[in-house]
């Protein structure tokens, strides 16, 4: 649970203050065990230290919402799943321990006769309360704070070391203390993995696992009275289960990660050659645009030729209508001139058509050149404007020539009449 709202200084100070207060209170509260008159295997007064330390840190430091993020009491499907694991894993540890006792010793101790002068229900309630106050401080508060700056695995290591120091027992010698340290550290690592990704819903899981472990050990083993073989069996069994559970969890998460990534790549493949495909598509689009421009230019050339034909027909109609105005004049010589003019117009039309075709070819060549230089738009507009201008100029020249020919014919007719 990464949350960078808490500064690095406050994060470090919170962890330090919590640990110092917890250790100091655990030393001071030892004297109250005999005062309250409760046997230590029912309820350890020193276990109140983490709860008190957590409350003090919450009151002293700011960002209360972040500090209380691991103290949610709601239930989810994942919490129920982890609660089942919190009951199954202690059972597996106890089964391994009992099998080890039967294999390497005569038998395990069942319902010890020493120190069990109280009802079992009192012991069960006492262990549930001990588990709650300890895990409230270490898992629901401290691990939540540590996870704001590091992932769950490393946060579990940090909290596990602190919890092992808090639970250290040097009364029965160094070897006993070493195995007790291994047991409590493995115990804490399992708890850290159990509460992973529960979004602050940690207290039920941690309390269930803690109470199940301590309650079973009271009745099956005698490590609380300093038996070295018992603590050795418990420590090794817990370490084996911790390694197996955490390793299996990592493998499952790794497989899930790879499967999810593969599915995402199938949906949206990360193709590093996409830019090549984009270039090919761009070139294809440009080629299509170029061919379309060439076709438009050819159509423009054809329309120019048809325009010339229209101008020719208009000129012929004008020339044909003019002699009808002078029906009294002689028709031989004007008709001869009209035929010559018509032939001249046909020659001019042929020249104009040739020029139009040449103009279309030049436009086509110009468009192809412009497409290679990425300047097709401006040249296309210019090339489309030129045939239209040329059409207007040629039509005007043909009409002017026809008018001049008519005037000349009228003059010749008037001279002959005279």
UniProtKB/Swiss-Prot annotation:
Biased composition regions of type Basic and acidic residues, renumbered to the chain: 282-299, 323-353, 379-418
Gene Ontology cellular-component terms listed: plasma membrane
Topology with respect to the bilayer: Multi-pass membrane protein
Protein localization: Cell membrane; Secreted, Cell wall; Cell septum
Record's subunit section: Interacts with N-acetylglucosaminidase SagB; interaction is direct and facilitates peptidoglycan processing. Interacts (via N-terminal region including transmembrane domains) with sensor protein kinase WalK (via N-terminal region including transmembrane domains). Interacts (via N-terminal region including transmembrane domains) with sensor protein kinase SaeS. Interacts with other histidine kinases, perhaps via their transmembrane domains.
Notes on the domains: C-terminal region not involved in glucosaminidase activity of the SagB-SpdC/LyrA complex.
Family to which this protein belongs: Belongs to the LyrA family.
Protein name, entry field: Lysostaphin resistance protein A
Source organism (scientific name): Staphylococcus aureus (strain bovine RF122 / ET3-1)
Gene: lyrA
